[in-house]
């Protein structure tokens, strides 16, 4: 039955986000997760409607207390954790997934890189805005909330840009 397989597919999409948030990959200067990669991947591979729905449901699961977020405790803490220092980044997942869905097969490699960079940037812009509001603008917000992750983000953007055209061909075929 197609509704059962669609339901299972929705579970797998959110599980991919959860798993990508929990696995730490050694990287310099800080370990990275593949969470932002998966957020962009969902937008590219599923389009904006299903990509946004998948990310939105993932965020809702975290808000409701499931331990889906990176560094969230085993029992989760729901809204309290969500409204902490990472809330802006988490909300940025929605804009990033949407913007990543705008990549298409006619885009040059440079355009794909540009679109994915803009999508990723929205995560950090919203994240830094919230972080600054939460901890104070007198702190080195960029040094805390973006600089340690720049190399990892460049790596993930390049990786996704290299496989994006194939992903879109598969999406269009299905």
Segments predicted by a language model, with ranges:
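Membrane-embedded alpha-helical hairpins and interfacial helices in multi-pass inner-membrane proteins
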Residues: 102, 106-174
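Alpha-helical transmembrane segments in multi-pass membrane proteins
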Residues: 13-17, 39, 43, 54-62, ...
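Short hydrophobic/aromatic-rich motifs at helix boundaries and adjacent loops
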Residues: 10-14, 70-72, 119, 135-136
């Amino acid at each position: 039955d197609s509704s059962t397989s669609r339901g299972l597919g929705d579970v797998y999409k959110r599980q991919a986000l959860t798993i990508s948030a929990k696995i730490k990959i050694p990287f310099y200067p800080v370990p990275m997760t593949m969470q932002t990669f998966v957020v962009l991947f969902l937008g590219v591979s599923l389009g904006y409607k299903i990509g946004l729905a998948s990310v939105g449901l993932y965020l809702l699961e975290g808000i409701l207390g499931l331990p889906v977020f990176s560094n969230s405790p085993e029992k989760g803490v729901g809204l309290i954790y969500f409204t902490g220092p990472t809330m802006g980044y988490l909300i940025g997942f929605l804009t990033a997934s949407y913007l990543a869905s705008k990549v298409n097969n006619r885009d040059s490699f440079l355009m794909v890189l540009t679109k994915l960079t803009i999508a990723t940037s929205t995560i950090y812009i919203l994240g830094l805005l919230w972080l600054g509001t939460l901890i104070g603008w007198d702190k080195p917000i960029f040094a805390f909330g973006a600089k340690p992750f720049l190399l990892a983000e460049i790596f993930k953007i390049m990786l996704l840009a290299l496989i994006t055209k194939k992903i879109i061909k598969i999406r269009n075929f299905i």
